[in-house]
């Protein structure tokens, strides 16, 4: 028989007592009452905050949106296939946040900041709340620096400044995304961080955008946040806020940033879906009453910060899709009233071969004029008016049989200006090239060039300036003004190209 030694027993007891962990873990736990359509009704969770992240038994995350008398309505940020009635739900005590770092550049992430491009984890030491308060009045500065899109018709007539919110609006398949992608490509070498947010798009479309940016060398300074059409409504709703948070992290470090929301119509639809399933009362077009606030709090985060705040900027280009050109629908009118101007794309112009299909008459930039470079401002002042008069005359001339010489001349110039403003996709132009093209059209220097050769003239003029007159390009690009010397070089170049074209015709 083994003898029991009292000293051993006392040593074991002392060891057990010293190892005893008397800390109490308190967690806010609830039970799933009902689950379906991406919405969970949860009983319990008395201490939960509005917008707090909750974790379900199977690891799915959700957001507590509806705090009611006897239950909490939570939206799921995932499939939630393992969640059943009676499953436990735990409040995390955290609000949705996204990791931010310079390592995110060139990556494709989910609205929760997780990588989805198969290139491994993104190292990050800090995170930022997805929803944060927009900078106040004192922290801001008026928009005064240009953000060149590389698209002649925009930079000359609807200029965009750093810190501005400019809406791109139009029917489906009118080239809205193309304008946004061109703008990103044109930021190469400008030290601008770009964030492209894809909401509710086909995964193939997003992959195509990534590929184009990679080919053009623009992915190195771009972050892509993707919530495709197959993702949960909550993720589609969160994606734009995630994009804004990532852009803000760079803005507060003094950098210039550009964020594109493609598109906010899909985000509004995802929010409507969530709100209706949460049984919130519907308003106009079945959208909830706070859908305006949903967009205004997002777009107000775009700003040009004061020098005391580091002088960074966040330029927002939200995209809205209209139905049959109806800009008076609920979401389009909301976003038009929030933004600092809009670029309206017309399907009629697109189908007639004018691309980018910008309707200059109803497109406007309310604050960009102060940011426009002097070189283009000096020569493009009359361009918008001339095109508007041309549209009016073109409509009138359809009914008139014989037109006087002055009217014919004006019509001819209008047609040539239209041709000059045509531009292929993914081929943005620099400032010097834009100045040359607009100058040739506005000053009437190409009135003798046949209409069908205007595009060729534009291409040949740009090539001629690059190869034979690089001093003109350097002068305009560095000084940002068209002085007498540069104007003389440009005029001579235009006449040279024109005479060689007419001689060979």
From Swiss-Prot:
Protein family: Belongs to the ATPase alpha/beta chains family.
Subunit: F-type ATPases have 2 components, CF(1) - the catalytic core - and CF(0) - the membrane proton channel. CF(1) has five subunits: alpha(3), beta(3), gamma(1), delta(1), epsilon(1). CF(0) has four main subunits: a(1), b(1), b'(1) and c(9-12).
Annotated SUPFAM superfamilies: C-terminal domain of alpha and beta subunits of F1 ATP synthase, N-terminal domain of alpha and beta subunits of F1 ATP synthase, P-loop containing nucleoside triphosphate hydrolases
Gene3D superfamilies the UniProt entry points to: 2.40.30.20, ATP synthase alpha/beta chain, C-terminal domain (1.20.150.20), P-loop containing nucleotide triphosphate hydrolases (3.40.50.300)
GO molecular function, one term: ATP binding
Required for activity, annotated site positions: 363
GO terms for cellular component: plasma membrane-derived thylakoid membrane; proton-transporting ATP synthase complex
Catalytic activity from the UniProt record: ATP + H2O + 4 H(+)(in) = ADP + phosphate + 5 H(+)(out)
Database matches in InterPro entries: ATP_synth_asu-like_sf (IPR023366), ATP_synth_asu_C (IPR000793), ATP_synth_asu_C_sf (IPR038376), ATP_synth_F1_a_nt-bd_dom (IPR033732), ATP_synth_F1_asu (IPR005294), ATPase_a/bsu_AS (IPR020003), ATPase_F1/V1/A1_a/bsu_N (IPR004100), ATPase_F1/V1/A1_a/bsu_N_sf (IPR036121)
Chief localisation class: membrane
Summary of the function given for this chain in its UniProt record: Produces ATP from ADP in the presence of a proton gradient across the membrane. The alpha chain is a regulatory subunit.
Domain of life according to the entry: Bacteria
UniProt EC number: 7.1.2.2
NCBIfam families: atpA, PRK13343.1
Keyword Cell division included in the entry's annotation: no
Enzyme class: translocase
Name the record gives this protein: ATP synthase subunit alpha
Keywords per UniProt: ATP synthesis, ATP-binding, CF(1), Hydrogen ion transport, Ion transport, Membrane, Nucleotide-binding, Thylakoid, Translocase, Transport
Membrane topology, from the record: Peripheral membrane protein
Binding site for ATP: 170-177
Keyword Glycosyltransferase set for record: no
